[in-house]
């Protein structure tokens, strides 16, 4: 009996050894696939939110690194961290560098500041009424201003105070509280024309920065403060906007920044996806599903930002778009990232950037056409400081090169013309107005090849601009 069943038992044992493990593997495959699917989906959705949430900070970190370190032979190093760089010429297409949609009316100051160790003092000279503003941007993109509109033009010492500072500030300093440990300061000083440039340069050179300790001692350290070793980049080559370096950079930044209590639930999701402030992002330990999800998230988020930047603005006046939701974003992470995606801007109380890209028929503005803006007597833009009009190539919002090397027009310039009744016009074309047209109050903004956008800058805009009552004139097409 035992012998009869031995082959059967042997066959059963062989089946248990050979078949069941195979069945086990087959049973595990759906589970493994499900895990990968969940990992990818979760990383994709949370990663998309994370990219939008952190885009501004990572973009500013990248910009800071490029301007404070020599990253290539062709890269201009502006100044070390905690020091100012001064642009002593008005910007042109040849000198604008990476600055997006710059103006051609002011000299720029730029500085990147690390407030972890101690506050930083910015000394502003007496500008004797000359317009200036310093836009102080934290790394969430929130903006504050000091300057003519807010603090006047007399000599003053401002102090940038980070979120962790505890202590009493000395008398004689005007504090500016910054919500992140890092800040970017972009200053503007008005220039009327070439004859005014040397006086404006003296004003720009009058700005200076010191640590609070240097200010107290009255002595500047012999070596300027530079970015701490090993702070950035995290990999070589460092491509934080288009690779998983983004999440590594964001993770490192989040781990050291104070965050709002209201962001806790969102940050917990970032932790679960591997890049929040309570974890350390490690690309080598990501599951394949998580890796795929985060890479997809970056593509989706960038596509969203491209689309968001093309959305129509609700405030449209005679074809001009008035973007007023700039510089203060609260919990609108998409708006914050969209603005950073296209460039950074002043608060609307400081400057409004009204843009026009199409004529009255909805056709894009073109360099081979002639346009005109007519401002009746008494209808100058209502501003407390000045206004200017510039043209930018639609493809990249850079200045339109032109033979006359004129990149803005405005009534703060000595060559600006008005008619005897106070009215004026602006011809927007390759060719200038005739002498008779100039005498009749027609000014000229040259343009170059291809489609472009007009930007009307309004510095210290009046209440009628801010509340929607002011409308720029309709653009006339002179030659179709």
Give the predicted meaning of each segment.
Residues 18-30:
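Bacterial Sec-dependent signal peptides at the C-terminal "C-region" and cleavage site
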Residues 27-480:
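A compositional/structural signature for long, glycine/proline-rich flexible linkers
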Residues 1-6:
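N-terminal secretory signal peptides that target proteins for export/translocation
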């Amino acid at each position: 009996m035992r012998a009869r069943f031995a082959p059967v038992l042997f066959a059963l044992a062989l089946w248990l050894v050979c078949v069941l493990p195979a069945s086990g593997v087959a049973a595990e495959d759906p589970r493994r696939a499900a895990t990968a699917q969940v990992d990818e989906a979760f990383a994709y959705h949370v990663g998309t939110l994370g990219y939008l949430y952190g885009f501004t900070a990572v973009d500013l970190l990248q910009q800071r690194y490029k301007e404070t370190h020599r990253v290539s032979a062709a890269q201009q190093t502006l100044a070390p961290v905690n020091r100012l760089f001064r642009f002593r010429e008005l910007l042109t297409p040849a000198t604008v560098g990476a600055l997006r949609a710059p103006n051609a009316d002011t000299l720029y100051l730029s500085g990147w500041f690390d407030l972890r160790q101690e506050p930083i003092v910015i000394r502003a000279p007496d500008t004797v009424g000359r317009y200036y503003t310093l836009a102080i941007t934290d790394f969430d993109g929130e903006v504050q201003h000091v300057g003519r509109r807010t603090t006047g033009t007399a000599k003053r010492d401002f102090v940038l105070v980070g979120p962790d500072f505890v202590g009493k500030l000395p008398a004689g300093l005007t504090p500016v509280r910054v919500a992140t440990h890092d800040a970017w300061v972009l200053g503007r000083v008005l220039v009327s024309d070439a004859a005014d440039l040397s006086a404006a340069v003296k004003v720009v050179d009058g700005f200076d920065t010191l640590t609070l300790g240097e200010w107290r001692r009255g002595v500047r350290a012999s070596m300027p403060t530079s970015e701490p070793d090993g702070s950035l980049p995290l990999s070589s080559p460092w491509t934080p906007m288009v690779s998983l370096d983004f999440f590594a950079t964001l993770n490192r930044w989040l781990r050291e920044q104070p965050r709002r209590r209201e962001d806790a639930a969102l940050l917990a999701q970032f932790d679960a996806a591997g890049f929040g402030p309570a974890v350390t992002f490690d690309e080598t330990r990501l599951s394949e599903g998580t890796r795929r999800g985060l890479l997809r998230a970056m593509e989706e988020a960038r596509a969203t930002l491209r689309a968001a930047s093309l959305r129509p603005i609700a405030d449209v006046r005679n074809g001009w778009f008035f973007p007023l939701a700039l510089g203060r974003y609260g919990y609108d992470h998409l708006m914050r990232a969209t603005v950073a995606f296209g460039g950074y801007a002043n608060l609307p109380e400081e400057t409004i950037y009204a843009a026009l890209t199409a004529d009255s028929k909805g056709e894009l503005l073109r360099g081979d056409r002639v346009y005109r803006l007519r401002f009746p007597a008494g209808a100058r833009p209502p501003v407390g400081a000045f206004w200017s009009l510039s043209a930018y190539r639609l493809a990249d919002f850079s200045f339109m090169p032109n033979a006359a090397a004129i990149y803005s027009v405005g009534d703060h310039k000595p060559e600006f013309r008005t008619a005897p009744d106070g009215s004026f016009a602006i011809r927007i074309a390759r060719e200038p107005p005739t002498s008779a047209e100039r005498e009749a109050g027609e000014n000229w903004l040259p343009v170059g090849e291809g489609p472009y956008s007009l930007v009307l800058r309004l510095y210290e805009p009046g209440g009628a601009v801010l509340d929607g009552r002011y409308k720029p004139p309709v653009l006339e097409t002179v030659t179709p």
